[in-house]
């Protein structure tokens, strides 16, 4: 399913994550690979702990960081697409 601003995303239940000195560290239980996010990536991860529309994630990131809406949307979608490909995030259709 293609990712869009209307998509609902949520962290996959097939991973475990922890905050380690301000960085989010994840272990994919399906691939046994470790991942690490810092800064904005960690904040996005916090926001998708529960099912959340991508548009809402962008609203929060654009408000909290000095970034244009267009750049924010492109970066958030790119980050989430990589997470989906890695099996760390599940995508649900939008409303």
Walk through the language-model features, giving the residues of each.
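Long, charge-rich, low-complexity alpha-helical segments
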Residues: 20, 33-95
